[in-house]
Structures are given as structure tokens and as C-alpha cells.
From Swiss-Prot:
NCBIfam families: UbiG (TIGR01983)
Protein's organism: Pelagibacter ubique (strain HTCC1062)
Reaction equation(s) it catalyzes: a 3-demethylubiquinol + S-adenosyl-L-methionine = a ubiquinol + S-adenosyl-L-homocysteine + H(+); a 3-(all-trans-polyprenyl)benzene-1,2-diol + S-adenosyl-L-methionine = a 2-methoxy-6-(all-trans-polyprenyl)phenol + S-adenosyl-L-homocysteine + H(+)
Enzyme Commission numbers on file: 2.1.1.222, 2.1.1.64
Protein name, UniProt field: Ubiquinone biosynthesis O-methyltransferase
GO biological process: methylation
The keyword S-adenosyl-L-methionine belongs to this UniProt entry's keyword annotation: yes
This protein's pathway: Cofactor biosynthesis; ubiquinone biosynthesis
KW Methyltransferase (keyword) present: yes
């Protein structure tokens, strides 16, 4: 059994060259990235009681699952974390490696999914950001991800809620009307309700500590953390 959805991998491999183009196919992710980075950084600092510095994450071992071209791996590395980035798309990893080398960043990138990591070393923090809606089997994926997390470690999972509003905004609006994303980027049937995600995680020794919405304000072109989880949401789990 594995968590890889070949159709999804092919879809993202086709546009892999555009990962680092802020005006390309991944423009929405570039706009979304600053709030994700801030949320992750602030929560890690708080939970691990880190005294902030230039490199606040310097003692943190972090695994970025479904890292794509490295949009989150690189900022985490710059913040001092020891980063491993994995993705099932060889093309994505090639792009990520090239960009990290160009920027003299030491990131360990591998073509893999969680169940494929052979050394099974444990991490302080795992990022599953905008990935669970693209995997083959979410239960298996969370189970395998959880195995890689240290006791009391943090797992961040960000995804899309399965609501009428998410269908209207994330698919009809973002893909068909505003053309922010290529048509077919998302499949509403694979969106996950927070209650489902919490249940699956609970079965895998993960306790929910935080659940927040992330909403886009079209008027000022910015993302904000809110209580509204009806479209995009982010969770923080702690390993029991």
C-alpha cells in the first residue's frame, strides 16, 4: 500500500518548472506563503519555548512532506531548521534541489512519500501543507506521517474543508472564474472536513491543539488567520 496518487503527481510534475515564478501557475501559493511561514514559525517558537533569535529554529529537525519546489522548505532552512523535504514527483525535487543549490541552502531533498523513508528517523516538526487533499489514502498517509514524528513533536496539516463554500471559492472561483489555478488542480471529493481530519489523527496518536481558518481578502490581496474554517484551514497536532 502507498499514499501516492499518480494522477496528482503527473498533474504537478507538468508545471514543476513554474514553482519559483511568483507570477506563474503557483502565484496563489506565493501569496499564501508569508502567512503560512509566520504561523508555523510562531507556533514552533511558542511550543518549544524558543528564545527568538536570527535563527530561532536552529535545533529543530523538520520534515516537509509534499514539499513541491521548496516554497516552505527554504524559509524553514533560513530560519535555522535542519530540513528534509520529500515529494513523490521527481521533477519537483529536481527543481527544489536546483533552487536550494543556487541559494546556497543545505536542504536534504528526496523523491519519496512518508512510507518510503527508509531510515525512519524522527522529526521535531512535520509539515503536511496543502497535501492531504492530493494523496491516495488519507488514513494511510497520516498513519505513516505520524510514525516519523517524535513524541511531543508538532504536525501542521493545512487543507481545504469540504463545504459548498469551498467548492464555490476554491474550485469555481479560483480555477474557472479568476483563473488563479489551472482547471483540475483540486477535486472537491478529496477535500477534508476538520472533524474527519481530527478523527483520523486521533487514531494515530495525534492530539489537536489548534484549528484556525485562513481567509483571503480580495480587496487588499492578503491572507489572514481567522475563525472561519469553511474554506482553507490549518491545524496543529501534538504527538502523544
Amino acid at each position: 500500500m502507498n499514499s501516492i496518487n499518480k494522477k496528482e503527481i503527473e498533474k504537478f510534475s507538468k508545471i514543476a518548472e513554474e514553482w519559483w515564478d511568483p507570477n506563474g501557475k503557483f502565484k496563489p501559493l506565493h501569496n499564501f506563503n508569508p502567512i503560512r511561514i509566520r504561523y508555523i514559525k510562531e507556533n514552533i517558537i511558542k511550543d518549544f519555548k524558543i528564545r527568538s533569535s536570527d535563527k530561532p529554529l536552529k535545533n529543530i529537525k523538520l520534515l516537509d512532506i509534499g514539499c513541491g519546489g521548496g516554497l516552505l522548505s527554504e524559509p524553514m532552512c533560513r530560519l535555522g531548521a535542519s530540513v528534509v523535504g520529500i515529494d513523490a514527483s521527481k521533477k519537483n525535487i529536481e527543481v527544489a534541489k536546483f533552487h536550494a543549490k543556487k541559494n546556497k541552502l543545505k536542504i536534504d531533498y528526496k523523491v519519496a512519500s512518508p512510507e518510503m523513508l527508509k531510515d525512519k528517523k524522527k522529526f521535531d516538526v512535520i509539515l503536511n501543507m496543502e497535501i492531504v487533499e492530493h494523496v491516495n489514502d488519507i488514513d494511510f498517509f497520516i498513519k505513516e506521517s505520524s510514525k516519523l514524528l517524535k513524541k511531543n513533536g508538532i504536525m501542521f496539516i493545512a487543507t481545504l474543508n469540504k463545504t459548498l463554500k469551498s467548492y464555490v471559492f476554491a474550485i469555481v472561483g479560483a480555477e474557472y472564474i479568476l483563473k488563479w489555478l489551472p482547471i483540475g488542480t483540486h477535486d472537491w471529493e478529496k477535500f477534508v472536513k476538520p472533524s474527519e481530519l481530527i478523527d483520523i489523527s486521533k487514531k494515530n496518536n495525534l492530539s489537536l491543539k489548534k484549528l484556525d481558518g485562513m481567509n483571503f481578502n480580495i480587496l487588499d490581496n492578503s491572507w489572514k488567520v481567522t475563525n472561519d474554517t469553511s474554506v482553507n484551514y490549518i491545524t496543529k497536532f501534538i504527538k502523544n
